[in-house]
Regions:
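Alpha-helical structural segments
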Residues: 7-18, 22, 36, 53-73, ...
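Helix-turn-helix
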Residues: 19-54
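Short glycine/proline-centered loop/turn elements that form peptide/ligand docking sites
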Residues: 24-31, 51, 137-138, 144-151, ...
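Short, hydrophobic secondary-structure boundary micro-motifs
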Residues: 28-29, 102-105
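Hydrophobic alpha-helical connector segments
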Residues: 70-103, 110-111
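Amphipathic alpha-helical packing segments from all-alpha helical-bundle domains
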Residues: 109-142, 150-165
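C-terminal peripheral helix-coil segments that are non-catalytic and often amphipathic
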Residues: 131-135, 153, 169-215
Length: 215
């Protein structure tokens, strides 16, 4: 992607984030996005097939960047602290984009839900943690290669989907939302083999501004 394309992408990202905070993407047209972003419709289609796809890709990019920041070098030694810090970063992202996620995760939403995107992103993140050897599988010595693959993939989907469900419940709590309380709850819900830090002080330190979601 060249510099001009990156500038266009940035304008599209700002536009869809603004519009999606107001109403579902099913009510947003490509023409409206293009007009606000100062581009034509054909340029829009070079970046996404539909408004919902554009929003999902923008949010997924932000979440993936946070994951890389906190988990790119995760190992078995630092997994609890790194995973907890990544969880806090995801919570802050969701809190910053609360208007968007409230619309995109609403029970009465018809189509264009953000839940599948979140499930995909977090499942991919968990699989990468497994691939780095940062998690010790229970009874690993008794598992065949096929059983290990089944456990790993099942565990990734299980942890990701459960975390997304918990994020959604937390999003419904009144602002200012309590991250520490969420960590206490999710710590009780996660399986015992999942690395998670019980002392949350360092993870709750103010976020580096460079890692925060951009408007």
């Amino acid at each position: 992607m060249d510099a001009r394309q990156r500038r266009t992408r940035a304008r599209l990202a700002r536009t869809i984030l603004q519009l999606a905070a107001e109403r579902p993407t099913s009510e947003i047209s490509v023409s409206e996005i293009a007009a606000r972003a100062g581009i034509n419709r054909s340029t829009f289609y070079q970046h996404a097939a539909a408004p919902c796809e554009l929003l999902e890709s923008v949010l997924a990019e932000e979440l993936t960047e946070l994951s890389m920041t906190h988990l790119a070098t995760v190992s078995a030694d630092d997994a609890p602290a790194a995973i907890t810090s990544a969880t806090v970063a995801a919570l802050r992202h969701i809190d910053e984009r609360a208007d968007i996620y409230r619309v995109g995760l609403g029970d009465d939403l018809i189509g264009a839900s953000l839940q599948p995107m979140l499930n995909r992103v977090f499942t991919s993140t968990v699989l990468e943690i497994f691939e780095r050897g940062a998690i010790t599988l229970p009874h690993a010595e008794c598992l065949s290669e096929e059983q290990r693959e089944l456990f790993t993939r099942s565990a990734a989907h299980f942890v990701a989907a459960g975390s997304v469900a918990a994020f959604r419940v937390w999003l419904d709590t009144p602002a200012p939302r309590d991250i520490a309380s969420f960590l206490e709850v999710i710590g009780e819900l996660l399986p015992s083999w999942w690395p998670f830090q019980t002392e949350h002080g360092p993870a709750l330190a103010p976020a580096d501004e460079s890692t925060l979601a951009r408007p």
